[in-house]
Amino acid sequence: MAGFWSKLFSSEEKPSSAQTAKDRLKVIVASEQGLGRRLSQDKIDQMKKEIMQVVSRYVSGVGEQHIQMQVRSEANIEMLEMNINLPEER
């Protein structure tokens, strides 16, 4: 996991800013067990609103329809996966 963060924030040759933004905005929070039981749909919706408010400070045109969040299981790990589709610049 440390390799992931060091790649995002290292001072070596950097990928395009669009790719960096995409990588930073795709967030996966993993838990060994019980994430789905701890996060109700109301909590996910509230988290979505708060994330939208933060992102909209830096990127114009981002709304709730641009943020997708889901809880899924993979290899006995439950994950909260979030994707933010940035609108085209006008």
UniProtKB/Swiss-Prot annotation:
<comment type="function">
    <text>Prevents the cell division inhibition by proteins MinC and MinD at internal division sites while permitting inhibition at polar sites. This ensures cell division at the proper site by restricting the formation of a division septum at the midpoint of the long axis of the cell.</text>
</comment>
<dbReference type="Pfam" id="PF03776">
    <property type="entry name" value="MinE"/>
</dbReference>
<dbReference type="GO" id="GO:0032955">
    <property type="term" value="P:regulation of division septum assembly"/>
</dbReference>
<keyword id="KW-0131">Cell cycle</keyword>
<comment type="similarity">
    <text>Belongs to the MinE family.</text>
</comment>
<feature type="region of interest" description="Disordered">
    <location>
        <begin position="1"/>
        <end position="21"/>
    </location>
</feature>
<dbReference type="InterPro" id="IPR005527">
    <property type="entry name" value="MinE"/>
</dbReference>
<feature type="compositionally biased region" description="Basic and acidic residues">
    <location>
        <begin position="10"/>
        <end position="21"/>
    </location>
</feature>
<dbReference type="GO" id="GO:0051301">
    <property type="term" value="P:cell division"/>
</dbReference>
<protein>
    <recommendedName>
        <fullName>Cell division topological specificity factor</fullName>
    </recommendedName>
</protein>
<keyword id="KW-0132">Cell division</keyword>
<dbReference type="InterPro" id="IPR036707">
    <property type="entry name" value="MinE_sf"/>
</dbReference>
